[in-house]
């Protein structure tokens, strides 16, 4: 029977939900092909022929355009067709496949509290849905899930789309010469319930919290004189369908997330279109040596934790333990004691059970309590809601090269010397503590401020970061982050190989830069000072995830020259196109308020690669971009960062950030439970090469999750599909350095080290990290923490191979450091 006859005979299929959809023979063929693959008989031609036989049987049994078959009818006939054709083994595999699919559907419906699954819920992996259900989907007062993943993505996309609507030419005038009555708009805040789902754009309805964001965004722009019409007139345009074109923008944002091409940071997905409305992940607060300020910071931190954000605080302004307190004639308790207060607040405010509270506690190397601070977390149970880092400035590096190595510790109260220590011994202490407990990290404030174009406007250097260290922020600044899934931008060639789609990458960067800029406008900040500081700089943090999976797809080793070159190009493109799009936004919407007071008008940019890489190695026209900035300004003070993306990568079903894969088989433990993962790309390759078996998987699990040294695995696979523990720590640093050259802010990455590294190795890593231009670093020696997020599936996992620096790193060190 040819296709035209099929189309005339069977037109539709009835799904389990009762919905009717178009019949598609290819779906039958694909299901049979998967059963063939399960029996190592992956034959597309045979699958197509068997699918044809299934259709013929459907017709024979009387199914027509008026008698529509159900999914179950078709699957029953597939089983009988496979048996009748003498393929009993394939039939068995199909029956197992069918049973597993039924079981998976039931599990998904149970997790989501649904009776049927829509296309988005079907598309997403079960573990992804578990994470969405546990943290992101709205619940009622009985803690029952009351929205589907589709509805979640719709509420996020709708809110972000509101950020575009008020910049429509019918409404917005950048000049700022349009006085409007903002009290009229504010009056609607008192009657939000009356406007719940009253307005929509296309098929996207505004709930009352969307409507609140529309009001607040209008008031913000009207206060600048940029609204040409009153708020009632805006509502008239909405009601009259004069703004329907923005449904396409909302759909674009929705599609980006549903396709797992891009995801914003967790608070955006948790809170967009909800009562809290707080969308940012990263915050920094100040802490001055005055009790009222300390208590305000504590209160502000609690509000941030409640809304799903994390806080970084530099405690170096607090006087050292034992110093005189003039007002009481007593002595100071020191900064660590106040960190304990914040730690307790974090413990009490559980962020609604959705996210564990997170802090970055920083003390700079010159502080008299630095030694106590360094060793504070070497025992379990101390400051468990904190990452801690030592802040390093130029003077510390200078002391390391001095003959005596003397380094002066000074009182924060009057900057007078308190004592001298040996800088080498201090670095040894940091290295020893990190070797024991993975704490503290190091933050290189000299590198952070080297190209800080914003310092001129703020009249101060940057002195703090968010909890994961990838965002350097001024006090009360926040930043909303988002990550592009790079592995989704790979396209398959006719010969079965893959290549990266650079055009789609550029398009995605531009769309997501606009997405994150909109988030600033529709955000409901937890503290007024944060609102002001965040909008003064309009800082965003666009990053990536899926780097390891991308390299696997392209068959490029992570720690190879080719791998580093590709990562450099990816990094440069990310920042170039995001900054170029930010300039375009400045041209249409206006530059960030403090732009004219920065070094941007002088032609400076916060990108080290522009200054430190030879111009002939630049891929893009940076000089032309600088001229555009001088002409039009730029919308966002910085646009790029690379976040760890732990939970986001689980939802996107890809590898974390720019990290290599931790292991090819591992267990992940998070707040909501224990999930098991196997790298799908490696699984496919093993199957393609007839190597996939329980025995091989057990060997990989028992080999520290690595392919290295397994006799049955070809050498090219061992070299290509490397894990974090296959890669020498110097290559981890090299990869971070390659990305850092082109990233405006910083990078959150773990420098993985095997159990048997020495304290001297850790110290050497610090020195190499600074030499490579990193803005900070964190080492993790395997087994050095009593609680470990990532675990090997096998309890018998052991490493049976040596790890050495790549030839690329050796050559770099030879050419740039030892000579």
Language model features by range: what are they?
Residues 1-819:
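Extended catalytic cores of very large enzyme megasubunits
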């Amino acid at each position: 029977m040819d296709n035209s006859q099929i189309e005339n005979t069977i037109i539709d299929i009835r799904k389990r939900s009762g919905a009717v959809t178009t019949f598609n023979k290819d779906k039958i063929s694909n299901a049979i092909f998967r059963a063939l693959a399960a029996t190592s008989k992956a034959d597309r031609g045979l699958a197509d022929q068997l699918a044809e036989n299934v259709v013929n049987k459907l017709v024979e049994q009387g199914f027509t355009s008026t008698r529509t078959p159900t999914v179950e009818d078709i699957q029953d006939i597939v089983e009988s067709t496979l048996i009748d054709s003498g393929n009993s083994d394939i039939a068995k595999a199909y029956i197992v496949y069918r049973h597993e699919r039924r079981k998976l559907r039931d599990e998904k419906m149970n997790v989501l509290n649904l009776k049927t699954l829509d296309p988005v819920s079907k598309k997403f992996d079960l573990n992804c849905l578990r994470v969405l259900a546990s943290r992101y989907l709205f619940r009622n007062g009985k803690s029952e899930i009351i929205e589907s993943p589709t509805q979640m993505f719709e509420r996020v996309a709708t809110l972000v789309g509101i950020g575009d609507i008020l910049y429509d030419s019918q409404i917005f005038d950048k000049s700022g010469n349009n006085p409007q009555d903002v009290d009229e708009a504010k009056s609607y805040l008192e009657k939000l319930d009356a406007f719940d789902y009253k307005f929509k754009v296309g098929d996207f309805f505004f709930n009352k919290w969307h409507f609140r964001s529309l009001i607040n965004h209008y008031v913000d722009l009207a206060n600048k004189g940029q609204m040409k019409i009153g708020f009632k007139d805006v509502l008239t345009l909405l009601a009259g369908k004069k703004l329907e074109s923005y449904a396409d923008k909302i759909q674009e944002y929705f599609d980006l997330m549903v396709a797992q091409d891009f995801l914003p940071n967790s608070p955006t997905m948790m809170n967009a279109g909800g009562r809290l409305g707080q969308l940012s992940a990263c915050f920094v607060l100040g802490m001055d040596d005055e009790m009222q300020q300390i208590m305000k910071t504590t209160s502000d931190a609690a509000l941030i934790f409640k809304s799903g954000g994390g806080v970084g605080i530099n405690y170096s302004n607090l006087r050292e333990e034992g110093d005189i307190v003039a007002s009481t004639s007593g002595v100071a308790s020191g900064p660590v004691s106040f960190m304990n207060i914040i730690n307790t607040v974090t413990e009490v405010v559980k962020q609604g059970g959705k996210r564990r509270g997170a802090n970055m506690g920083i003390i700079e190397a010159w502080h008299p309590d630095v030694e106590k601070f360094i060793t504070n977390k070497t025992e379990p149970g101390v400051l468990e809601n904190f990452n801690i880092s030592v802040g390093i400035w130029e003077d510390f590096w200078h002391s390391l090269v001095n003959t005596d190595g003397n380094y002066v510790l000074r009182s924060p109260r009057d900057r007078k010397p308190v004592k001298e220590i040996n800088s080498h011994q201090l670095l040894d202490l940091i290295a020893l503590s990190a070797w024991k407990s993975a704490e503290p990290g190091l933050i290189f404030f000299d590198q952070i401020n080297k190209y800080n174009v914003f310092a001129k406007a703020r009249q101060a250097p940057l002195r703090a970061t968010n909890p994961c260290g990838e965002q350097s922020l001024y006090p009360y600044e926040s930043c909303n982050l988002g990550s592009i899934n790079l592995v989704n931008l790979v396209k398959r060639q006719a010969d079965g190989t893959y290549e990266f789609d650079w055009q789609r990458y550029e398009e995605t960067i531009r769309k997501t830069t606009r997405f994150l800029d909109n988030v600033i406008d529709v955000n409901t900040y937890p503290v007024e000072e944060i609102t002001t500081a965040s909008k003064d700089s309009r800082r965003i943090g666009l990053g990536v995830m899926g780097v390891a999976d991308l390299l696997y797809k392209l068959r490029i080793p992570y720690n190879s020259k080719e791998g580093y070159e590709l990562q450099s190009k990816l990094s440069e493109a990310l920042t170039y196109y995001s900054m170029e799009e930010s300039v375009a936004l400045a041209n249409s919407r206006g530059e960030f308020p403090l732009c004219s007071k920065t070094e941007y008008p002088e032609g400076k940019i916060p990108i080290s690669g522009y200054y430190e890489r030879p111009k002939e190695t630049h891929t893009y026209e940076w000089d032309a971009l600088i001229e555009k900035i001088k002409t039009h300004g730029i919308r966002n003070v910085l646009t790029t960062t690379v976040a760890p993306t732990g939970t986001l990568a689980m939802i996107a079903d890809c590898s974390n950030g720019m990290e290599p894969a931790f292991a090819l088989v591992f267990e992940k433990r998070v707040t909501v439970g224990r999930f098991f993962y196997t790298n799908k790309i490696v699984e496919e390759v093993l199957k393609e090469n007839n190597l996939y078996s329980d025995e091989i998987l057990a060997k990989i699990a028992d080999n520290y999750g690595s392919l290295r040294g397994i006799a049955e695995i070809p050498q090219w696979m061992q070299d290509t599909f490397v894990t974090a523990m296959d890669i020498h720590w110097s290559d981890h640093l090299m990869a971070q350095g390659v990305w850092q050259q082109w990233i405006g802010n910083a990078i959150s990455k773990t420098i993985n080290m095997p159990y048997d590294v020495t304290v001297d190795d850790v110290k050497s890593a610090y020195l190499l990290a600074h030499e490579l231009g990193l803005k900070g670093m964190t080492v993790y020696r395997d087994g050095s923490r009593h609680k470990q997020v990532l675990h090997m599936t096998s309890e018998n996992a052991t490493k049976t191979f040596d790890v050495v620096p790549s030839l690329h790193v050796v050559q770099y060190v030879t050419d740039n450091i030892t000579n």
